[in-house]
Amino acid sequence: MRTLWIMAVLLLGVEGSLIQFETLIMKVAKKSGMFSYSAYGCYCGWGGQGQPQDATDRCCFVHDCCYGKVTGCDPKMDIYTYSEENGDIVCGGDDPCRKAVCECDKAAAICFRDNKDTYDWKKYWRFPTKNCQESVPC
């Protein structure tokens, strides 16, 4: 447990927008991104290749593609601004790149929420990468 706490504290200082992404997932999908989506299917987690395995994995595929289209900042590191208005997440700020990252994260969180019924932990958690070989373009 202590190791997990230390890792979480280290991540807070290192991965700005990834922590925000976790927060958005918690707010919108009511699940922990770290414990639910960090090693799921072919695309949820670090990297990604192959065919998305279900609608949840496709959320991660689309999120990866969205990050790939962002230019001018680092989607995983740079902090963005957002607010909540009438239960909706509203991305803000003057930096178009950071706003785009926020929109990517918001869309993924909504996708996770809308596809909770496809989430199959037993089948796709720590899915073997050998089953993720076919390349799929964004």
Curated annotation (Swiss-Prot):
It holds the Pfam family Phospholip_A2_1. It is an enzyme of class 3 (hydrolase). The active site is at H63, D105. GO terms for cellular component: extracellular region. It is found in: Secreted. CDD domains: PLA2c. Disulfide bonds join C42-C132, C44-C60, C59-C111, C65-C138, C66-C104, C73-C97, C91-C102. Ca(2+) binds at Y43, G45, G47, D64. Its cofactor is Ca(2+). Gene3D superfamilies: Phospholipase A2 domain (1.20.90.10). Binds 1 Ca(2+) ion. Expressed by the venom gland. Its main location: secreted. Keywords: Calcium, Disulfide bond, Hemostasis impairing toxin, Hydrolase, Lipid degradation, Lipid metabolism, Metal-binding, Platelet aggregation inhibiting toxin, Secreted, Signal, Toxin. Residues 1-16 form the signal peptide. Its EC number is 3.1.1.4. It catalyses: a 1,2-diacyl-sn-glycero-3-phosphocholine + H2O = a 1-acyl-sn-glycero-3-phosphocholine + a fatty acid + H(+). One of its GO terms (biological process) is negative regulation of T cell proliferation. Transmembrane segments: none annotated. GO terms for molecular function: calcium ion binding; calcium-dependent phospholipase A2 activity; phospholipid binding; toxin activity. The keyword Ubl conjugation does not apply. Belongs to the phospholipase A2 family. Group II subfamily. D49 sub-subfamily. Snake venom phospholipase A2 (PLA2) that shows a moderate inhibition of ADP-induced human platelet aggregation when tested on platelet rich plasma. Exhibits high hydrolytic activities and prefers the anionic micelles (dPPC with deoxycholate) to the zwitterionic micelles (dPPC with Triton X-100). PLA2 catalyzes the calcium-dependent hydrolysis of the 2-acyl groups in 3-sn-phosphoglycerides. This is Acidic phospholipase A2 Ts-A3. It comes from Trimeresurus stejnegeri (Chinese green tree viper).
